[in-house]
Amino acid sequence: MNAVTAGAHALRHDWTLAEVQALFALPFNDLLFQAQTVHRAHFDPNEVQVSTLLSIKTGACPEDCKYCPQSARYHTGLEAERLMEVEKVLERAREAKANGSSRFCMGAAWRNPKEKDMPYILRMIEEVRGLGMETCMTLGMLTADQAARLGAAGLDYYNHNLDTSPEFYGDIITTRTYQDRLDTLAYVRGAGMKVCSGGIVGMGEQAKDRAGLLMALANLPRHPESVPINMLVKVKGTPLENQENLDPFEFIRTIAVARIMMPASHVRLSAGREKMNEQMQAMCFMAGANSIFYGCKLLTTPNPDENSDMQLFKRLGIRPAQRAQKPDQVQEEELLAEVSRQSEPAEMFYDATRPRAGAARS
């Protein structure tokens, strides 16, 4: 069984660099055909999940990520803002839902959340979920306790990107380690949340680094449920402002290989989309991208406006995905209840969500 066939039929966590590089080296049409075949085996090919991203705390970040205009180390003209008030966040969430978004993502330019801000963060999660939307946050590094509190508040997804390969990482960021990022992802998993993790291409990395990034993501104990693939947005004042553009076909290849390696994950066409023409975006959807950020801004960088996105969707026959009417936990509880009701004898089944008499509590 070759790498492509294995990727189409199984979730693998043992990819080698040689296998990933072999996928990247496929003729372009063959690669897209393989990616689309895998995509159709796991998803409706004409449905795209739509998220809205809001910066709830902007700028003055102490980290030194060379691509980021929110770093306090670079002079980008970005005005720092304090944590947004909860009601203002809810106003934006209501607008996002009305415009067709099923998930609301909230990002804060922090190294890690401070204790004084946690009550407001937790309330944002609870209130946005109350609107019937999925929730996602990106707040920097987390402790195990912080992850547990976010999970208990009902956070659906936590975003924490690996950014690039372990080998190239030190050329881009020095203020936190690759292992720091992996630790945060482990805490998120341990708290029962879904993982959103991807990276940025076009930062001057080599082809083997794009392969290494996808290998690091696919070889996690569980694949991220959402894998954002970002094209570098070059911002004046950052160290990467004059970086050469990545070949568009190489970006599309990265989308396709991500789809093959992580067949059941949503692959998000993320930052940099504002610079892509409609034909390139359509090819990304053909390559297996099935999620986008919707709205005129991603944190602090431009994004196509809502009308142009919906017009493109209409021309391509693409539908925005709808959120499941009931959360996974509710569906699971109802299924268990139905199984228990129909079982004979009833003692053969029990509701795993309820403690059993005499059972030890964890």
From Swiss-Prot:
- Cite the InterPro entries for this sequence: Aldolase_TIM (IPR013785), BATS_dom (IPR010722), Biotin_synth/BioAB (IPR002684), Biotin_synthase (IPR024177), Elp3/MiaA/NifB-like_rSAM (IPR006638), rSAM (IPR007197)
Alphabetized PROSITE patterns for the sequence: RADICAL_SAM (PS51918)
Which pathway does the protein contribute to? Cofactor biosynthesis; biotin biosynthesis; biotin from 7,8-diaminononanoate: step 2/2
Which residues are recorded as binding [4Fe-4S] cluster? C61, C65, C68
Annotated residues that bind [2Fe-2S] cluster are located at: C105, C136, C196, R268
Q: How is the cofactor bound?
A: Binds 1 [4Fe-4S] cluster. The cluster is coordinated with 3 cysteines and an exchangeable S-adenosyl-L-methionine.
Q: What is its EC number?
A: 2.8.1.6
Residue ranges of every copy of the Radical SAM core domain listed in the record:
46-273
**GO MF annotation: an example:** 2 iron, 2 sulfur cluster binding
Q: Which cofactor does it need?
A: [4Fe-4S] cluster; [2Fe-2S] cluster
**In terms of domain of life, where is this protein from?**
Bacteria
Q: Per UniProt, which keywords does this protein have?
A: 2Fe-2S, 4Fe-4S, Biotin biosynthesis, Iron, Iron-sulfur, Metal-binding, S-adenosyl-L-methionine, Transferase
List the SMART domains: BATS, Elp3
Looking at the UniProt entry, the stretches that span the membrane are none
Q: What class of enzyme is it?
A: transferase
Which residue stretches belong to region Disordered?
320-339
- Reaction it catalyzes: (4R,5S)-dethiobiotin + (sulfur carrier)-SH + 2 reduced [2Fe-2S]-[ferredoxin] + 2 S-adenosyl-L-methionine = (sulfur carrier)-H + biotin + 2 5'-deoxyadenosine + 2 L-methionine + 2 oxidized [2Fe-2S]-[ferredoxin]
Query: What biological-process GO terms show up in the record?
Result: biotin biosynthetic process
Family membership, please give it. Answer: Belongs to the radical SAM superfamily. Biotin synthase family.
> Quaternary state and partners of this protein?
Homodimer.
Q: What does this protein do?
A: Catalyzes the conversion of dethiobiotin (DTB) to biotin by the insertion of a sulfur atom into dethiobiotin via a radical-based mechanism.
- NCBIfam families under this entry? bioB
Q: Which PANTHER family match?
A: BIOTIN SYNTHASE, BIOTIN SYNTHASE, MITOCHONDRIAL
Name recorded for this polypeptide: Biotin synthase
